[in-house]
């Protein structure tokens, strides 16, 4: 895995990650069974961000999602750089969330993307 920074994005479903995101992470178990030391050594060199979008008070009710990822990153030794929680339910809704967009722009400026 050549990437230095990992960005995990998910809609917030029932105060946690989507089923697809959770399944992706659950699949790591196979790698941990077969190549645990190598897998964890690679993740320990990474920095990760979390971006979650939800409709129902995401900046408060999305915090369990953030905490879940904090535990995942603690387990894998991955540096947790931060998170952005935005408000949206329909396609394009996030464009009305100035706070989330500003937070993402701040991250982008640090990466010079």
Q: Model features per residue range: what roles?
A:
Residues 1-74:
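Helix-loop-strand module that forms the ligand-binding subsite of alpha/beta enzymes
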Residues 59, 67-113:
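Glycine-rich phosphate/pyrophosphate-binding loop and the adjoining helix
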């Amino acid at each position: 895995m050549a990437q230095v920074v990992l960005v995990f994005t998910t809609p917030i479903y029932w105060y946690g990650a989507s089923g697809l995101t959770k399944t992706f992470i659950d699949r790591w178990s196979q790698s941990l069974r077969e190549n645990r030391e190598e897998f964890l050594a690679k993740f320990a060199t990474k920095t990760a961000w979390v971006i979650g979008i939800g409709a129902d008070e995401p900046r408060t009710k999305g915090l369990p999602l953030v905490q879940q990822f904090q535990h995942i990153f603690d387990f894998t030794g991955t540096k947790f750089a931060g998170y952005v929680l935005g408000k949206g339910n329909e396609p394009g809704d996030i464009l009305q969330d100035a706070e989330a967009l500003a937070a993402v722009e701040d991250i982008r400026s640090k990466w010079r993307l």
